[in-house]
Amino acid sequence: MIEASKLKAGMTFETADGKLIRVLEASHHKPGKGNTIMRMKLRDVRTGSTFDTSYRPEEKFEQAIIETVPAQYLYKMDDTAYFMNTETYDQYEIPVVNVENELLYILENSDVKIQFYGTEVIGVTVPTTVELTVAETQPSIKGATVTGSGKPATMETGLVVNVPDFIEAGQKLVINTAEGTYVSRA
């Protein structure tokens, strides 16, 4: 069992009614009067729906045991993403709604880790940084420096990242997948 105060982004737990929930955001909130509460943005792993809720810090949940296996992203068709276990060559279908954020960081044939809850595939873990090519951005401004506020750039996967002014379309960039931010040129 894990207390609500110990839940952090990325953790998965099971509710009393059997729902498998992943924490997207968690923060302590101390109202002017009364006790501290935990405000959380959560995702139902099975349905993909997200919702905001709050818990008392002492509330307890059953922490889900999640196993991961190495895999490769194959392709996306309609509302399904296809992955292959690189050890057993088994293929898995995951609804896009469950991995839509992760798909912004990976290209076909990218290495990932598939997450299992028992025998049920529940998600995908992407590397901490990935290399993506800039598909579209505003033209560079002569004399632009790194200290500027930056500009939006659309990557080849559709991800929009704020980049320095000197970045141009066609350049490969290193992107932090946890924050969705520019790290450096590749």
Swiss-Prot record:
PROSITE patterns in the cross-refs: EFP (PS01275)
This protein's UniProt keywords: Cytoplasm, Elongation factor, Protein biosynthesis
Subcellular location, principal: cytoplasm
Keyword Protein biosynthesis: yes
Pfam families on file: EFP (PF01132), EFP_N (PF08207), Elong-fact-P_C (PF09285)
Matching InterPro entries: Elong-fact-P_C, NA-bd_OB-fold, Rib_uL2_dom2, Transl_elong_fac_P/YeiP, Transl_elong_KOW-like, Transl_elong_P/YeiP_cen, Transl_elong_P/YeiP_CS, Transl_elongation_fac_P
Family (UniProt): Belongs to the elongation factor P family.
Biological role: Involved in peptide bond synthesis. Stimulates efficient translation and peptide-bond synthesis on native or reconstituted 70S ribosomes in vitro. Probably functions indirectly by altering the affinity of the ribosome for aminoacyl-tRNA, thus increasing their reactivity as acceptors for peptidyl transferase.
Name recorded for this polypeptide: Elongation factor P
Species of the source: Streptococcus pneumoniae serotype 4 (strain ATCC BAA-334 / TIGR4)
Gene: efp
